[in-house]
Amino acid sequence: MLAELQFTEARKEFSALYNEVFNSYRPMIIKRKQTEEVVVLRTDLQKMLLSGFSLKPEVLHEADGSITLALDQLDIFVNAASLEEAIKELIEDVKTYAQDYMQRSQLFINAPNRRPHFPYVLRVLLCENDEEIRGLLEM
């Protein structure tokens, strides 16, 4: 089982908590009241946990010569004149969706068709730039 701290203790000893999680690679659970729990985890370990959530879009060559990229995991689809334009549009749409998802997280987490998007959204939001997002898309 993971180590647990009560919220008040975690607040008082935040520096020690941070050092334990970061330097010792040990996630911790912080509890408040009877039902509220959060996990504190290093970002690199979170990225590792999410690495299995692949975001590889399907590439469709349309009859008019355009390219459609279909990212079924997030229900995002783009169409552009070239593959490179479609990739750029997809990256922008994925970023916009991820930001919107987090701004309205209570809505999306409680929507049965959007709840499964959470790990993909978090994976995108942990990227530092468009190149990292492009890498996630394997494009």
Locate the predicted segments by residue.
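Glycine-centered loop/turn positions within well-structured domains
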Residues: 12, 28, 76
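Short, mixed charged/polar active-site loops
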Residues: 2, 36-37, 75-77
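The conserved cystathionine-beta-synthase
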Residues: 7-23
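Non-catalytic interaction/Regulatory regions outside core domains
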Residues: 1-5, 80-81
